[in-house]
Amino acid sequence: DYNIPQIYWEIGHPAADYDNLIHWWAKHAASRPLFIGQDVMRTVNKADARNPLQNQMPAKMKLQRSLPTVQGSCQWYAAAVVDNAGNYRTMLEKEYHRYPALIPESPFMDDKAPGKVKKVKMVWTYEGPVLFWTAPKAKDEMDKAVQYVVYRFDKKEKVNLDDASHIVAITRDHFYPLPYNDGKT
């Protein structure tokens, strides 16, 4: 279904250079999604050869994002991210992954998207405004919608569903309580 090579070494490692390995995997991923396995501690404990005042996280992220076949990364081990070793989690949240990510498409498994939601309406409740919708119908279990993405755009703003900065929620529910500030939803 997908590839997650454990490229746990650092850029410049004499036996297993991260740069060489990621390029090899980017070329040989066999037309399947490619996510890079990152070793958090090696990344934050090794200096960037081009900028010794910082760790290797910026260089690795730049390299990953420069390769179109690399669709993301997985961090090992999770506790190092939770514990914010070397400000790793902070950098992910503030610099690299500020907005929610959607589950990548897998057209080789199923290329039929669920239908569009229907009967979208806002209802005032005792807790404030809530957006409701009806799930699209599907004949096959694989074609059912299981999550919904709620975006927010200003009235005069052009809708761009590729701009993740407008995602306010990803939910399995058929409703979303709208934020209500200063008389605006």
Predicted regions span which residues?
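Substrate-binding cleft of secreted/luminal carbohydrate-active enzymes
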Residues: 1-14, 22-108
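Short, solvent-exposed loop/turn elements at domain surfaces
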Residues: 45, 83-84, 131, 141, ...
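Solvent-exposed loop/turn segments flanking beta-strands in beta-repeat/beta-sandwich domains
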Residues: 136-164
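Short beta-strand segments within Ig-like beta-sandwich modules, predominantly Fibronectin type-III
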Residues: 166-172
